[in-house]
Amino acid sequence: SFDISPDGKHISYLAPYKSRMNIYVTGIDLAEPHQVTFEEDRDVEGYMWANNNRILFMKDDGGDENFQLYGVDADGSDMRPYTKMKGVRTHILDDLEEIDDEILIETNQRNPEIFDPYRLNLKTGEMTMLAENPGNIQAWMTDHDGKLRIAYSIVDGVNQEMLYRDSEDEDFRPVIRTSFKEDVSAIVFTADNKNVYAITNLGRDKSALVLMNPATAEELE
């Protein structure tokens, strides 16, 4: 699979090396490609550009499907594991396109059955837990500043609850509960991070795009 760096200056792709898929990078003119990773035990399963220079990729060890997150510079230097923990699985939650050196990830390092969200500093490797998942959170949503502000949980096995907080210093609080026949799905925050655009079918026979106050679930327009 081919991918282009955010500044449009480099192209990356996967190709075999010693029977394993690895990352290669070349200029936009496709001249002089160079190998970035040299994995021999397992394939690079997926990768992405974190910024114009840093590439992130996923790989498991020994086929245990506990995928870990690694990072490497586009020239092949500074390769490091970010979440190499035995028995732990990692997911990328949000690549935070507007923040170069941070991403949000989920890991089950606290509890094997539950994934908690963390902010990962790509320069230092520091991980900061953003919330403790009680076990029923199915989705998280950030604002344009990369702050985790909305969560969705499953209640009673069938109903869904939207939770909200004004800042990451606060606890999430429930805003609205919907049945399996109803839907309120926040899509994106407005530019000022105060309201959200959402898809909902509440009070109507078809889903509609609305402007909503996430603190109250009130439709504004």
Regions from the PLM with identified roles:
Residues 30-34, 53, 63-65, 72-80:
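Short helix C-cap/helix-to-loop transition motifs enriched in small/turn-promoting residues
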Residues 1-14, 40-61, 69, 86-109, ...:
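Conserved beta-propeller blade repeats
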Residues 27-31, 73-77, 121-125, 166-169, ...:
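Short loop/turn segments that connect beta-strands within beta-propeller blades
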